[in-house]
C-alpha cells in the first residue's frame, strides 16, 4: 500500500478535479472530459509501450489513430449498393493486384540475396502495379464518387456493429506499423521521428483525398452507436421514472403540476445526455483497465525486462543473443495497434469521421506531452498524464477567464487591455501547456509518476 501511495494520491486529486467540474460547471462537461481522458489514456499507453519500454520515437501516432477511425467507418456504415454496382468490381480487382504485388515482393526478398537486381525488381513491381491500378480503377473511382455525392459518394462499409471496429482498427494500425517498422526502424532516432511523422501525414492525405473509400473532407456522419440515443431515452418510461426518482427532492419543492412536469421534462433531457456519457465511460473504462492489466503484466515479465535491457543498452542486449530488430518491430506494432483502438473509440463516441480534424498538434505532440508529464516507462504515469494534460487542455479557457477577471477587476469591460486578453483566451491553452511542460521538465524530469524498476 505504501509504495502505491503516490499513485493513489495523484489519481484521487485528478478525480477530485473532474468532480469539481461537475459541481461548478455541469456533469455533462465533467463526463465529456472524463471520456476524452480515457481515450487519451489509451493513446498514451500505446505511446508509452513504444517509448517507455523500448525507447522508440514514434511521431506518427496521428496516422494510426486515423486508421482506427477509418475502421469505424468501414465496419459500421451500410454498404452503398449503387456505388458497388458502379465500380466495386474494379476496386476489388485492384485490391487483388495489391495482394499479388505483396507476394511477389516477398518472393524476391526471400529467394534473392540483397543486390541491385532485387532492388530494381521490387521497384519495377511497385511502379508497374501503381500504373496498372491507376489506369484500370480511375474510371470506376469517378463513377463511385458520382453516386449521390451529397450523402454517399463512397462504397460504404460492412454494416456491422461499430464495436467490432475497435479490434479491426488495431489490426489496421498494426498492419501499417509492420510496413513502417520493416522500413524505418533501422534508422537513427531523429530520422525515425521524422520518418514516422511524414508517413502519418501521407496516411492522412490519402484518407482526405480518396473519397471513394472515406468520403474525404466531406466527412461521414451518423455512425452507429453502441449506446442508446438520447432522444430514445427521453421517451422510455423506465428512464423517466428513474430521473423522477433520482430528482424527487427537487420535484417535491414544486407545487404546480404544470411546472413540475416542465421541470421533469428538462431533467429528462439533461439526464439522457448524462446517461449516454456514463455508458461510454463504462465501455472506455473496461478498455483502459484491460490494457493496464495486460501492460503491467508484460512490463514485469521476463519479456518486459528484456525490452528495458534493449532500451538501456542495445549493444549489450544484442551481444547476449537477443534479436533486437525483431523485438523493436514487435513493440512498434503493439503500441501502434493500441493507438488504433483509441482512434476507433474516438470516432465511436463522436459518431462521425472527419479526416480534416487530424492534426499533429492534437493527435501526436499532445499525446507525447501526456507521456512526458505523466512519466514514461510507468503505465500509471502515462495514464495520469493523459488525464492531467487533457483536463488542462479543456479547462484552460475557464481558468484563463477566471484569471483575467481576477487581475483586471478594476478595469472597465471596454478597456482595450481587458478586451485584448479576453480575445486571446483560446491561445492560453498553448501557454499553459508550455509552462506545465517546462515546470515538469525542470522539477520532475522523469514525470509525475516516474518509472520504478522492481527487482524480484
Locate the predicted segments by residue.
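Transmembrane alpha-helices and adjacent helix-loop boundaries
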Residues: 1-456
